[in-house]
């Protein structure tokens, strides 16, 4: 199972991310393979998984250089854009779930994440994630940045459905509609809704 999955990852990385330096592509594949094999996403655990015939010190340096590379953030966005384009093939509607969540217990940081899925997929694949201070939870500017990025990456003609949990407000849904996309949103108890031209009613 892991061998087959690694081949899929390698095929995607080498086929879609050819502009990324070859050495980093190889290390990307090795690191992703290590995580898929059950190793924790930490510098020391990844280094142990990548030791091979070398020393742990050398493996630590490799992983540290990858994590500390100033280009890795931009290259991660390139990878997410390529993944999104891959998911858009076949003409099926693309469902994108957007939500805010805590990065870790304690609530110091929060993450705005978008996960894409289509018919036949077991679970969504993360295509966008950005970390903010907890004070930015629900921030409208951060949410606009997400939509702007996804729209820039999205191939023309794709039917998109955005799904959100409670907490997203009317301006968000208006922005989604302006992009020509559909949306589904969960609302909290006590919220009133209205079809255009009708009276407000409690949902």
Give residue ranges: language-model regions.
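Extended, highly charged
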Residues: 1
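Electropositive nucleic-acid engagement tracts
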Residues: 4-8, 12-92, 148-149
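Intrinsically disordered, low-complexity boundary segments flanking structured domains
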Residues: 80-86, 113-115, 172
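An internal, acidic/charged active-site-proximal segment
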Residues: 129-203
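RNase H-like nuclease fold core
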Residues: 56-58, 62, 91-154
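Short active-site-adjacent helix-start/loop capping segments
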Residues: 71-74, 104-108, 171
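Short, conserved catalytic/metal-binding motifs centered on acidic residues
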Residues: 46, 95-102, 124, 160-169, ...
């Amino acid at each position: 199972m892991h061998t087959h999955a690694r081949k899929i990852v390698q095929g995607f990385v080498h086929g879609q991310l050819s502009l990324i330096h070859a050495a980093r592509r190889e290390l990307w594949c090795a690191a992703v393979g290590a995580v898929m094999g059950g190793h924790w996403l930490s510098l020391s655990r990844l280094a142990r998984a990548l030791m091979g015939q070398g020393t742990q010190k050398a493996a630590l340096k490799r992983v540290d250089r990858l994590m500390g590379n100033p280009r890795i953030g931009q290259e991660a966005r390139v990878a997410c854009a390529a993944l999104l384009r891959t998911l858009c093939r076949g003409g099926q509607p693309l469902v994108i779930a957007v939500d805010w969540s805590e990065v870790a217990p304690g609530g110091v940081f929060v993450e705005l994440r978008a996960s894409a899925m289509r018919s036949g997929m077991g679970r969504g694949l993360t295509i966008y994630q950005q970390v903010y201070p907890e004070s930015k939870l629900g921030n409208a500017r951060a949410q606009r940045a997400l939509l702007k990025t996804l729209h820039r990456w999205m191939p023309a003609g794709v039917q998109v459905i955005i799904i959100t949990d409670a907490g997203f407000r009317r301006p968000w849904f208006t922005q989604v509609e302006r992009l020509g996309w559909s949306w589904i949103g969960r609302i909290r108890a006590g919220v009133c809704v209205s079809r255009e031209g009708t009276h407000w009613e409690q949902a």
